[in-house]
A protein has these predicted regions:
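Internal maturation/activation junctions in enzymes
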Residues: 76, 172-251
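Flexible, polar/acidic helix-loop-strand segments at domain edges
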Residues: 160
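Noncatalytic scaffold domains of N-terminal-nucleophile
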Residues: 1-107, 111-157, 174, 217, ...
Length: 251
């Protein structure tokens, strides 16, 4: 599985998800819901420091695509902290959704633009992939963290990693150390490394592979993983845990 390029692109599901949520739980028309987003896409917003850093890290790759450079770079450079970023193309796409609902995205001008670019880059997406897309209603996974229940989206999303991180962090006296103390930050960073090592090792599409969700979210598993954190040294390389009977589902 490549890490970049057209073959990493799946059928976009957000718009269908918004529509399903609105029909089930909402009362406002989609045009009202999208008005603020359209405003910020068209008029712009100041870029925050962390977003500017992420943009800077991706600037070389964005520069390789004329369309991406035109959309996401400002006069050839990534948006800097405090600069106003505008995305009029996104505003136009959102207006079509506001006017026609999901058909304003999965059919018509936006859909054809998606398919045209996919074809140009050697992708395999077809009209039917967009027109027939349906979101899935799923049951969340959860853990507890110091008495609080925390829910996340189940695999094949990465939500399980956040829950595993919390379980590992629960093994340490974070509050006693102070939330922004060096000790606490060290444990948070190392817990993230451990959680993502297990994520990449065991989590894939549940339609095609068995995923040990209960085991990964057990407190015993977190306690064992926490033992791998050196309190005085950052791990240069983190190995996934070994769970008997499971193989690498992510490829």
């Amino acid at each position: 599985m490549p890490t970049a390029g057209i073959h990493t692109v799946t059928v976009p599901g957000a718009v269908a998800g918004w529509e399903a949520l609105r029909h089930r739980f909402g009362t406002l028309p989609v045009a009202d819901l999208l008005t603020p987003a359209i405003h910020y896409a068209e008029e712009g917003f100041p870029v925050t420091e962390i977003v500017a850093q992420g943009w800077s890290n991706a600037s070389e790759r964005l520069s390789e695509s004329p369309a991406a450079a035109k959309t996401y770079l400002i006069e050839g450079h990534p948006p800097r902290t405090g600069e106003i970023f505008r995305n009029p193309g996104l505003a136009s796409s959102l207006r079509r959704i506001a006017a026609s609902g999901r058909d304003g995205f999965y059919r018509g001008e936006t859909a054809q633009a998606i398919l045209r670019l996919s074809n140009e880059l050697g992708g395999t997406m077809a009209d039917a992939d967009l027109e027939q897309f349906e979101p899935e209603w799923i049951s969340p996974i959860h853990t507890t963290y110091r008495g609080w229940t925390v829910q996340e989206i189940p695999p094949n999303s990465t939500g399980i990693a956040a829950l595993l991180m919390l379980n590992i962090m629960e093994q340490f006296p974070i509050r006693e150390w102070g939330f922004h103390s060096a000790k606490a930050l060290h444990v948070m960073i190392e817990a993230k490394k451990l959680a993502f090592a297990d994520l990449l090792r065991y989590v894939g599409d549940p339609k095609f592979s068995a995923i040990p969700v209960e085991t990964l979210l057990s407190k015993d598993h977190a306690a064992r993983r926490a033992q791998g954190i050196d309190p005085k040294r950052a791990a240069a390389r983190v190995r996934p845990s070994h769970l008997e009977g499971y193989t690498n589902s992510s490829g």
